[in-house]
Design a protein with these regions (language model features):
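Residue-level detector of anion-binding/catalytic polar loops
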Residues: 77, 94, 224
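Conserved catalytic core of nucleotide-sugar-dependent glycosyltransferases
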Residues: 60, 81-199
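N-proximal low-complexity "stem/linker" segments adjacent to membrane-targeting elements
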Residues: 1-50, 54
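Active-site neighborhoods of divalent-metal-dependent phosphate/nucleic-acid chemistry enzymes
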Residues: 200-209
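Short active-site alpha-helical segment characteristic of glycosyltransferases
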Residues: 214-217
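Short beta-strand-to-loop acidic/aromatic patch adjacent to the donor-nucleotide binding site
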Residues: 67-79
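Conserved acidic residues
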Residues: 41, 69, 94
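Active-site nucleotide-sugar/metal-binding loop of Leloir-type enzymes
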Residues: 57-70
């Protein structure tokens, strides 16, 4: 854990202002655990934002306006154990995420397991939000902190150190949500936002979602 009593901002894009019961109960458990560890915790939600890239960038802006040490993205439909966030903190990585499954069944994996005579087919049904490094395939060894390096991980459950965004600020475009100005003062009605999260096309021609784009951006500028 980088800071002795870290300050954490939990950020949840919440389109339509809705979350699942699993998320709500998980958040209560996490709050209790973090409080017992003397972590100062804030919760920020962004409701009724249909564009996820803009939503995540706005939440990152809110984070940078605070004095928090960590930005913890958690999607509104994620269920997680109460010690999951402390586990990420203990890993002490610049960017680290918890792996969660997609809303689909990996039938190819189930089929291979069945052909191999496996009996516990449910254990092979998950399709997870990550891409492994290079030619690692389906296997990688954990390091001393209990994590593995991946090429891409999901922002549905991702912890980011403040130093990451501070470093990237100089390498990304900025924008305003609108160009509207206050008619009385002439000031812009919305603040400048850094575009940490965007969609992009990588060098293989693959369209990257905003979380995978962020991973590529951080790796491009020396991160891991």
């Amino acid at each position: 854990m980088g800071a002795k009593n870290p300050k954490i901002m939990i950020a949840t894009p919440m389109y339509g202002g809705m979350c699942t019961g699993g998320y709500a109960l998980s958040l209560l458990g996490a709050w209790q655990t973090l409080t017992s560890l003397k972590c100062e915790t804030y919760i920020a939600t962004l409701m009724n934002e249909s564009l996820i890239t803009r939503g995540r960038n706005d939440l990152a802006r809110m984070f940078l306006e605070r004095d928090a040490d960590y930005l913890m993205f958690i999607d509104a439909d994620i269920t997680f154990p109460k010690d999951a966030i402390p586990a990420l903190l203990l890993a002490d990585k610049d960017v680290v995420c918890g792996v969660y499954s997609k809303k689909e069944i990996a039938w190819d994996s189930v089929s291979r397991a069945a052909q191999a005579g496996k009996s516990n087919l449910a254990e092979y049904s998950g399709s997870f939000v990550l891409n492994m490094m290079g030619a690692q395939g389906d296997h990688a060894e954990v390091d001393e902190s209990g994590v593995i390096e991946v090429r891409h991980g999901g922002t549905g459950f991702m912890l980011i150190k403040r130093s990451v965004l501070e470093k990237l600020k100089d390498h990304v475009p900025t924008y305003r949500r609108t160009s509207f100005r206050n008619p009385e003062t002439g000031d812009y009605t919305h603040p400048v936002v850094h575009q940490f999260f965007d969609t992009s096309i990588d060098d293989t021609g693959a369209l990257l979602s905003e979380d995978y784009h962020f991973c590529e951006l951080w790796r491009k500028h020396g991160g891991q």
